[in-house]
């Protein structure tokens, strides 16, 4: 499908969902990530708004931003501001997200990506995910389901030319299983069970993921903020 046809298709989907697409709406957003799972989540949710989300060009060659903030908001803002300086005039969206488990006092929290290793960027993503999940399972071993509550949190920061324009927070509540289920997710998705739909995040298709996930919730807030044509 060519670009014009894709935009027409997205417009029809948006119309059917009652989403108004302004002719002056920002049509492209650069995402500060090289994580293919996150990019899929972003692109799938943005499609119905007629918005294209792609990774920042040559993102892997940019200096790594140290995620040393105490909150998801602090890390998201830091990344958005730093990476937006590399693409002058472009709207950049950065994400910081993680899993908070009540029985672990909110851990892994902002350390979710590096829970089993302080330098996760040096590891293959599958190895990193397996190690992080294994640590969570060890720490929750023997706990009954009612003690395994937690939530995924996502904070998005939109920035241009080094300045944060707005942040958006999304939360998804669930239960941490005692064994992984599903193959379509990434990170802690195979362990995160949503009783409302009877599935883990790794068992959801793209449409379901956009509807129920923390990232989908935050992204809808961002897209609603963007849709009147703001921040052109």
Description of each model-found segment:
Residues 16-30, 36-232:
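Anionic-ligand binding patches
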Residues 2-4, 8:
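Intrinsic-disorder-associated, low-complexity terminal segments enriched in Asp/Asn/His/Tyr and depleted
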């Amino acid at each position: 499908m060519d670009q014009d046809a894709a935009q027409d298709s997205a417009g029809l989907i948006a119309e059917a969902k009652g989403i108004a697409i302004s002719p002056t709406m920002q049509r492209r957003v650069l995402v500060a990530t090289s994580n293919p799972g996150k990019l899929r989540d972003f692109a799938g949710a943005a499609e119905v708004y007629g918005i294209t989300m792609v990774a920042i060009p040559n993102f892997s060659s940019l200096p790594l931003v140290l995620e040393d903030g105490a909150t998801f908001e602090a890390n998201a803002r830091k990344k958005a501001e730093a990476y937006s300086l590399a693409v002058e005039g472009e709207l950049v969206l950065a994400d910081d997200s993680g899993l908070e488990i009540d029985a672990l006092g909110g851990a892994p929290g902002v350390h979710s990506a590096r829970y089993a290793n302080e330098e996760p960027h040096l590891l293959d993503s599958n190895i990193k995910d397996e190690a992080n999940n294994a640590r969570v399972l060890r720490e929750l071993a023997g706990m009954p389901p009612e003690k395994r509550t937690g939530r995924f949190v996502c904070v998005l920061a939109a920035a241009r030319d080094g300045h944060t324009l707005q942040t958006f927070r999304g939360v998804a509540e669930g239960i941490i299983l005692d064994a992984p289920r599903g193959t379509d997710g990434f990170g802690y998705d195979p362990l995160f069970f949503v009783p409302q739909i009877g599935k883990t995040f790794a068992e959801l298709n793209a449409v379901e993921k956009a509807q129920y996930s923390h990232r989908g919730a935050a992204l809808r807030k961002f897209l609603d903020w963007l849709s009147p044509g703001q921040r052109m």
